[in-house]
Amino acid sequence: MHTFLIVLLIIDCIALITVVLLQEGKSSGLSGAISGGAEQLFGKQKQRGVDLFLNRLTIILSILFFVLMICISYLGM
C-alpha cells in the first residue's frame, strides 16, 4: 500500500509540474501595477477554455498531492 501511494504521488507530481508549465503566464505583474496597468490587474478577467481547465486541474492535482502526502505520512508512523 505504501509503495502504491508513493507511485501515485510521483505521477501526481509529474502531472502537476506539467499542468503548471502549460498555463499561460500573466504578462502584467508587479511592474504593470506600478506603471499604470491597474485596470487590468483589478478588472474582472474571466478565464475561458483551456485556461479554465488548466486552472481547475491544478487545484485538483494540488489537493490530491496534499492528501497523498498526509496518507503516506500516516502510514509511515
Curated annotation (Swiss-Prot):
Cross-referenced InterPro entries: SecG (IPR004692)
GO annotation, cellular component aspect: plasma membrane
Localization annotation: Cell membrane
Key words of the record: Cell membrane, Membrane, Protein transport, Translocation, Transmembrane, Transmembrane helix, Transport
Coiled coil: none
GO molecular function, one term: protein-transporting ATPase activity
Subcellular location, principal: membrane
Pfam families: SecG
GO biological process: intracellular protein transmembrane transport; protein secretion; protein transport by the Sec complex
Membrane topology: Multi-pass membrane protein
Family: Belongs to the SecG family.
Role, per record: Involved in protein export. Participates in an early event of protein translocation.
Record protein name field: Probable protein-export membrane protein SecG
